Amino acid sequence: MIKVKNAKFITSASRITQAPPPILSEVVFMGRSNVGKSTLINTILDSNLAKSSSTPGKTRLINFFETCWEDMQTNQNLTFNIIDLPGIGYAKVSKAEMEQWKKSLWEFITKRSNIKLFIHLIDSRHLGLEIDENLYNVLESFLRNDQNILRVFTKADKLKKNELAKLYQKNGVIMGNK
């Protein structure tokens, strides 16, 4: 088991040239707007470092957090960055701003050399959406051998028991923070 020792906000960037140098391995949280990326990051880090809101499009920049974890069995530390990306899809922004986001995000996820894991968050109440399938397919299209994709289904607490059972049967793992 690993446990977070500490986490801190590093910086926000609107494009890859503003990002901190890729020194540590990186884990990217991505998905549709308002799927719970920032909330999940805060839950995992047991903090309120990532700004979250019920308003879609709250995260408008690429946010970097440095984290240090302790392996409880070996007492060894592991340090890596967590990256909170703006949501894909709906947000209360202009069309021009949305296009700039898409361009910046594409450049970031395809060119950032230290990304090792893409955590693709999917709202468990809205499975099979084209936007989620497209995102997964895009990630697979450029995935390197040293990278992985992990699908995480959020908002499972809003499902009925039979819907939760179907989600579990199809995907195998269900976790909660309550």
Please state what every model-predicted region is.
Residues 65, 176-178:
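Short, highly charged low-complexity linear segments
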Residues 23-24, 42-44, 95-98, 133-137, ...:
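Short, glycine/charged-enriched secondary-structure capping and boundary segments
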Residues 88-98, 157:
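Flexible beta-alpha connector loops of hexameric P-loop NTPases
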Residues 1-92:
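Conserved G1/Walker A P-loop phosphate-binding module
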Residues 53, 93, 120-124:
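Conserved short-loop catalytic and cofactor-binding motifs
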Residues 69, 96-101:
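Generic secondary-structure boundary signal with a strong preference for alpha-helix termini
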Residues 77, 102-176:
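Conserved C-terminal guanine-recognition region of P-loop GTPase G domains, centered on the G4
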